[in-house]
């Protein structure tokens, strides 16, 4: 609520709400752009007005996936679909409205909560005799708990040391693998 109903000072904004269902984003473009783009811009404006650090979580979907090497933060983006485009819009909204921000691009997120690849594979393994999983896409499966720990670390470092290296960072698990190999594991 724009910091108006908070009892005490606010030092950190962490954008956690997102429309992350890639395929449904294609059919619901306006909603994806609103949630992943415009709403993020509104949050960034509020953080700017109140002097709050914003940590925004984005995605590797801002790239087209054709690079033979891991993407660098300085690589040009080329989102292929609505989801990637909407997340890029969110990143740009943060950059335009707020100098003090951290954008963390993650990939292949899995964890205990929510829908994700690991939970889907476990469910399908119970329901089917055999599974077919693509082997031509590579990435770094990233445990959601590690992302949370990184956010806490970055926030703690900012509190202790003051200004830090604002900008965009990539964070993913290792080793890099294919969806097929990840499913087999």
What are these model-derived regions, one by one?
Residues 27, 35, 81, 139-142, ...:
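Residue-level signal for the nucleotide or nucleotide-sugar donor/cofactor binding architecture
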Residues 92-140, 144-153:
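NAD(P)-dependent short-chain dehydrogenase/reductase
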Residues 1-35:
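NAD(P)H-binding glycine-rich loop region in Rossmannoid oxidoreductase-like domains
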Residues 23-31, 65-69, 114-115:
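Conserved catalytic-core motifs of eukaryotic protein kinase domains, centered on the activation segment
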Residues 13-16, 54-59, 64, 104-106:
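SDR active-site strand-loop-helix element
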């Amino acid at each position: 609520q724009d910091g108006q109903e908070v009892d005490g000072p606010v030092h950190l904004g962490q954008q956690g709400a997102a429309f992350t269902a890639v395929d449904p984003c294609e059919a619901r473009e306006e909603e994806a752009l609103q949630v992943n783009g415009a709403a993020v811009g509104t949050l960034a404006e509020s953080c700017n007005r109140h002097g709050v650090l914003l940590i925004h979580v984005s995605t590797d979907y801002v790239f087209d996936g054709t690079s033979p090497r891991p993407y660098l933060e300085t690589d040009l983006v080329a989102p292929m679909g609505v989801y990637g485009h909407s997340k890029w819009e969110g990143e740009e909204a943060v950059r335009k409205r707020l100098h003090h921000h951290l954008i963390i691009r993650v990939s292949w997120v899995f964890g205990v909560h929510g829908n994700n690849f690991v939970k889907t594979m476990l469910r399908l393994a119970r329901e089917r005799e055999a599974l077919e999983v693509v082997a031509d896409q590579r990435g770094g499966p990233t445990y959601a708990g590690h992302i949370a720990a990184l956010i806490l670390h970055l926030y703690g470092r900012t509190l202790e040391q003051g200004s830090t290296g604002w900008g965009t960072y990539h964070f993913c698990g290792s080793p890099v693998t294919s969806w097929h190999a990840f499913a087999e594991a």
